[in-house]
Structure formats: structure tokens, C-alpha cells
Amino acid sequence: LILCYIPTNLCNLKCEYCLVSQVDGWHERKDIEFKYPIEHMIKAFSKERLGGECFINLTAQGETLLYKDIVALTKGLLEEGHSVEIITNATVTKRLDEILSFPEELLTNLFFKCSYHYEQIKDKKIEGIYWSNVKKIKESPCSFTIELMPYDKIASSIPDLCERCKKNAGAVCHATVGRDDATNGKNLLTKMSKDEYVNTWSVLKSDMFKLKMDLFGKKRKEFCYAGAWSLLVDLSSGEASQCYGRMNTQNIFKNLNKPIQFRPVGYSCMQPFCFNGHAHIAWGMIPEYNSPSYYNVRN
């Protein structure tokens, strides 16, 4: 599992629960400097260097499809033989169409996580664009999922958002869990009690939501293989860490002849809980934890 972080803030939506849109210049194209060209990055992620085929997640701080080199990067990773996941709000049609024009043998290894920003798009022109693009993906050889960010303001709209999902995508969306990163304990991003929050959003019957709430606020003390079986890589520099909650420990772009160090977190996790467990525990980073598979939390 390779988690690629693209540190670009540019986004075309302004969501009140998102930290990116709270900073000045969030909607302006101010591309940061990427130290290495795409061709170099692809070589850094070669199957030989990584030890085989990997599942590679591409996530920008803003909208991933607005990263200027996302098409070339995605194609290069697929051609290398990896499976690729793109996190997107599914509204950047031009880039999406370019990607969907790839050969079928590449698209079968491509997965889109389409974030459903219900309040920001409902009954607006952009909602038509969103569902049109979701349908394009559905009709392609790619895989996809719809994921909602649940928050208090839209709790009363659950029946409506479920109906829109069923009508346009064929199934009710999954749900993630919002957290308040301004708090040391990464508290739930809600004014509800935990029980009320769970009862409210469990109606979606999302395995993603259930797993994240099962993990929420519970310190993991088992041996964790993140770092041995996964990496988090900053694509602007090549700096890499074992997971989201660790400091960078190596640069995997600087010297392509230098072996990548795969060292597990083990018993030394310092986080209050595994806040992105769907991206680690669902992939088996803690083998003794009886987790649903990544397939289940995304299907």
C-alpha cells in the first residue's frame, strides 16, 4: 500500500468542514514546486524497487484532478503494473475524460473514490456534472465508490441524499468520519454525542463508517506493520514516512539506486487512535484485528 500525498491546495469547491478552504488562496492556482519530473517518480515506484505490484493511492490536499500532472502520473503508474486509486470530487470533467481514454487494460486497475459533497453541489449545475461523471466512470472498466462526509448540517437530509445516490449511482453512499484536528485527541467533528452521531449515520449501513467508528478513540497497542507493508510519500519531494502519524524517515526519490527501507511501526504508534484505519487496518496492517477488507469498506 503506497499512499501518495500531493500538497496542492487548489480546489473548485468550498466545504465548511474542510481545512483547505479555510486558508487564503485555496482557490488560486499556485502550483508548488515539485522537485522531480513525473518520469523520475514512476521509476521511483517501479515494481522492482517496491517488491512487486502495489495499490497506490493519489490524494491531493485540494482536488486531486486539478494537479497539473495527474493524467501522466496516473498513466505511468498503471503502465508500471500497479493498481491506482484517485480521490476526487468528480467534477473536473476534462481531466477525468483524459484518464478514461486510457486503454482498457489500464482502466481495469483504476479505482475512483468519488467524494459526495452533498450540500455544496445539490440542485446546482455542478450536481449534474458530478453525476454525469460518476455515470461515465460506472460505464467504464474502472471501479468506483461514493463517499459522503457526514456532518450535522445535513443530518436531516439523509433520505434525500440516499435517494439521489440510488437514482444516479445505483446504491447508497458510504460515509467517512469527520474529526476535529484542532484537538489533541482528534475529536469527532460534531455537536452530537457519540451515540447520537453513530445512530444518526448508521442508517447508511456503511462498512466504512462502522470500521472507522469501531476504531475511533481507541488506542492501538498491537504490532502494526505500517511502514513495512505501506508507505506515505510526499510527491513534491519524495520524503516518506511509515504512515500518516509518523515523521519522515527517508527520501525515496533522491537516489533511485538506494533501496527503500521498509520498517514497521511495531508497538511505537504515538497516535490517540488509528484515524485512517480504513487505509491501513482494512489492508491488514494489524493482522490480528478482525477488520472488513478494503473491498468491503469501499464496495
How would you name each of these model-derived features?
Residues 1-21, 55-59, 230, 234, ...:
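N-terminal pre-triad scaffold of radical SAM enzymes
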Residues 45-49, 78, 99-109, 131-139, ...:
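Acidic (Asp/Glu)-rich catalytic clusters
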Residues 181-299:
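Accessory C-terminal segments flanking Radical SAM cores
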Residues 20-32, 278-288:
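Iron-sulfur (Fe-S) cluster-binding segments and ferredoxin-like electron-carrier domains
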